[in-house]
Amino acid sequence: APAKLLASGCGDLIANVIAVKDWQLGHKKKKEYYGRYAADLALMSAEIVMENSSEFAKKGLDSRVIVEGLISAGVASCIAGSSRPCSGAEHLVSHALDKLAPGIGLHGEKCGLGSIMMAKLQGQDWKKIVKTLKNVGAPTTAKQIGLKPDVIIKALMIAQDLRPERYTILKEIKMTEKRAL
């Protein structure tokens, strides 16, 4: 598979770190079902990429490892009965970007960007996500995939409205233009 598509797959996998944290938040705040096995499987899928990203940077992306991670993430969603283990606020940002700038950037690239921003909001190690994405050759800025800053700001402001029933970190804050900056 082309390196760009594999890197995009890595962005989609890294998103699981954000999604699981959002799922835990939904469980805590809304008593939403939370399945530890599905969550752990989704996290393992992300961690395989994160732990091997330095190796990928040296030797190139290992398509088998990435595809296995994506399959495991899909299994985690099947076990959970929803996309919750693999789709949180970072995917809402990706979907908002799809709506505002259709056809620009690959799904996993936008999930990777969303993961950086949402990790910062969640208090997670966003710099580790940036490093991992760089190591696998995925974009870490909007400019790298052809998105303008105003589109990112608008996406952050509308993201939670796309799935109001899904509790994410975006429900915890009032996303304004000033905050999005």
Regions found by a protein language model. Give the residues of each.
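Carboxylate- and glycine-rich phosphate/diphosphate-binding segment that chelates Mg2+/Mn2+
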Residues: 1-84
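Alpha-helix initiation and N-capping motif
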Residues: 7, 46, 63, 90, ...
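C-terminal charged capping/lid subdomain of soluble metabolic enzymes
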Residues: 13, 123-181
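Short, hydrophobic/amphipathic alpha-helical patches that form generic packing surfaces
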Residues: 16, 71-78, 112-121, 158-161
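Short helix-capping/linker segments at secondary-structure and domain boundaries
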Residues: 18-26, 81-84, 103, 121-127, ...
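Short coil/turn segments at secondary-structure boundaries
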Residues: 28-29, 61-68, 87, 144-148, ...
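Amphipathic alpha-helical segments within well-ordered protein domains
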Residues: 50, 54, 94, 98, ...
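C-terminal catalytic subdomain
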Residues: 87-124
